[in-house]
Amino acid sequence: MDNPLAIFEATKEVSTIEMNAMVVQLQDRLMEMEQVEIVTLHKFLPGIYERTIIIPPWTVLTGAEHRTAYKVRLERGTIAVSTDTDVKILTGPFEFDAPAGFQRAGRVFEDEVVWTDIYENPDNCRNIEELENRLYVVPDIGLYEYRQLVKGELLCQEFGQQQL
């Protein structure tokens, strides 16, 4: 695919394998570009872990594959999001159940997006690294707040990580 953003312009459903390939290709292309700051907030409730990201307008991003099913709460903004076979445009407030096993891509429009993933956390773990390893297939490039591309080298840097 010459244009990795074509994932958001598709007018028909594709196979899960094709969609996954498009998301991975987009991720690879995005890593060649300057990385935008995406603020990540962590909230712990009894038996629940909430991970909120605040995505600036006009951002294109990819997430990690999830190991478990989870709930999504799109608190505000509009985003085009890949599913296993197509792309949906969602506007907050909106909630949905998300299955395990998929890596998603998103394209934010003119307003910032506040997106919260809600996970079961039966042992009330508060160790972010442990939770990430439980919940995600962490890509070699890391997760949102650890990505930064500088002069062709990946550096690990923590951006705006806060705990509520």
Label every PLM stretch briefly.
Residues H66-T85:
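Glycine- and acidic-residue-biased ligand/ion/polar-headgroup-sensing regions
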Residues M1-T52, L143-L164:
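A short, N-terminal "cap"/entry segment at the start of jelly-roll beta-barrel domains
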Residues A69-Y70, V87-I89, N121-N124:
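Short, surface-exposed beta-strand-loop junctions and turns on beta-sheet-rich folds
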Residues F109-L164:
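Double-stranded beta-helix
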Residues T52, T83-R104:
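Short acidic-glycine-tyrosine-enriched beta hairpin
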Residues T62-G63, V81-S82, A98, D117:
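Short hydrophobic/aromatic-rich beta-strand segments that constitute the beta-sheet cores
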